[in-house]
Amino acid sequence: MDNLIKSLETFKNQMKNENLEIIISDSNICGEGEHKMMKIISNNYDKNSNKKICIYGLDADLIMLSLINQLSNNIILLRDNTFNTKLNESKRIYTYLNICKLKTYICKDLRFGNNNLSEISDLNLIYDYIFLCFLMGNDFLEHIPSLLIKEGGINVILKCYNFVIDKYKSPLINLNSLNNNDWKSCINLDMLKDIFYNLSKSESYFFTNIYSAYKSNKSIYKDIYDLNSINTTENSNIYFYTEDKIKYNETGYKSRYYQYYNVININSACESYLIGLYWILGYYNNHCHNNWSWYYEYHEVPFASDLYSYLCKNKNKFLENINYCESLQSSSCISSLEQLFLVLPKESLLEKYFLKQGNSKLITKLFTFFGFFSGGGIWQ
């Protein structure tokens, strides 16, 4: 990384006479690239300007962060979909996404046939939409087990949202509370509870019919079988599990699910998941809690029915404690070296160097075996 940073600085110096402003935010500056990029855009561009901001990339994080950026009307994302790197520029195929138009279509779709949304701002609708997408899974939390993108999960969650909004006639996310770090009232937990309830009504049908249908399709595991056949040596530290130990299409799948993923206390898992939703919401909102230490300690997330049951019994107690939750308090950033140790291969030279030190605390951050269970769903 040091060599890369030096090379980037050299490139920046070489471009001094090209009338370009080059901003480098390297690994020594805390934060993910997309978030740092959005902060730079917000701090360096006039929101009243008509100048277009072009960003290379089309991943979900980048799209969602662009939707809630104060300059969203000016942002255009693009990506080169040409896999042949030898093609000249004129023959390349690019995909463009106009964030302003996307925002308009999302709001139009949410408002269609629902007069109860007329008092809710477009920005608030976008925040609601993004929060609902958290339930589909992201870099920090897995998806709700009965929600899969390839099985129309987004449409399912939006139907639940429209049903609930008819009842409450107010947004799911309170932007004033969110911007003031008032966690207790930034999410309408009664609405979220009802969304979980509506999701839970079709849970058993989903696993018995929809989920088990494609799980029986052996072709979706072809690449995994090929990888496992390669990793047969005694020293191999990666293995992909394909057998469906949980048997979702049989009675008792919930108990087997929690047992398989070593979830002993379901209430604790539900609480951790909900705290995770608050953390991610704050993270997307300019990282307003400035917390760098939170992580979800379980491999998978609870069922919608269990999240509903948890909120029915524990909502008030949860809200009493959320403003004082350690995971939503400011903390120190993890160093670049610590981050590297979280992902380094066991036999790396850097790891060997620290092993010689004997008492290095960083050694505890190394992984030794990696097992991937593909039974939770196909690549989405």
Please give the residue ranges for each predicted region.
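Noncatalytic, typically N-terminal accessory segments of nucleic acid-processing enzymes
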Residues: M1-Q380
